[in-house]
Amino acid sequence: MSLYPKAMDELIKNLSNLPTIGRKSARRLAYRIIDMDPKKVDELVESIVNVKTNIRPCANCGNLTDKKLCDICSDQKRDNSVITVVEDSMNVISIEKTGEYNGKYHVLGGLLSPRDNIAPQDLNLENLFLRCKKDYVKEVILALSPTTNGDLTTNFIIEVLKNEEYNVKVSRIAMGVPLGANLEYYDEMSLYKAILDRREIK
């Protein structure tokens, strides 16, 4: 026998499917939603549907946007010669918060993971390598988290870009941050320093 009405049990189950949300947190959220004004609930549902309907990866870099090209790719004042490679759009936000980076980005949409069967073709890698062949791209900064999968992905990209057909400098952000940490949890100063102190690999 369930402790909750069927509709509430379904809500708790669906909320607990979200990353970092356990069943206990999902239960709290469910009770909060029940107590919310119906109009606010409708607005929440509309926002979720709107995001799923209108938000998509940028056709150029993979960052999330509601247009064909994201605002960063469309900004003519940004430095086209430098591309920083990150795992996801949350990492873009983290770097942008430093207020010190003026280049472009490339969002992979994940990391290589043999354990989870995530292979190169499952990530936004092909478009990265196409961008790196363009004459105006001079440097690729690898800003992936210092985790096992992050290192695996970084090393894969380095090996590909070592090929003579790619005339770009490749560098990696300094590792003055805890191993295993995700970039989104770095404070702005640490992240800025990590980019500033990046080391050249190729």
UniProtKB/Swiss-Prot annotation:
GO molecular function: DNA binding; zinc ion binding
UniProt cross-references to SMART domains, sorted A to Z: TOPRIM (SM00493)
Keyword Endoplasmic reticulum: no
Membrane-spanning parts: none
Pfam families xref list: RecR_C, RecR_HhH, RecR_ZnF, Toprim_4
Zinc fingers, C4-type class: 58-73
UniProt keyword annotation of Zinc present: yes
Domain Toprim: 81-178
Any GO BP: DNA repair
Top-level taxon of the source organism: Bacteria
Keyword annotations of the record: DNA damage, DNA recombination, DNA repair, Metal-binding, Zinc, Zinc-finger
Family: Belongs to the RecR family.
Function: May play a role in DNA repair. It seems to be involved in an RecBC-independent recombinational process of DNA repair. It may act with RecF and RecO.
The protein's name: Recombination protein RecR
Species of origin: Finegoldia magna (strain ATCC 29328 / DSM 20472 / WAL 2508) (Peptostreptococcus magnus)
Name of the gene this protein is made from: recR
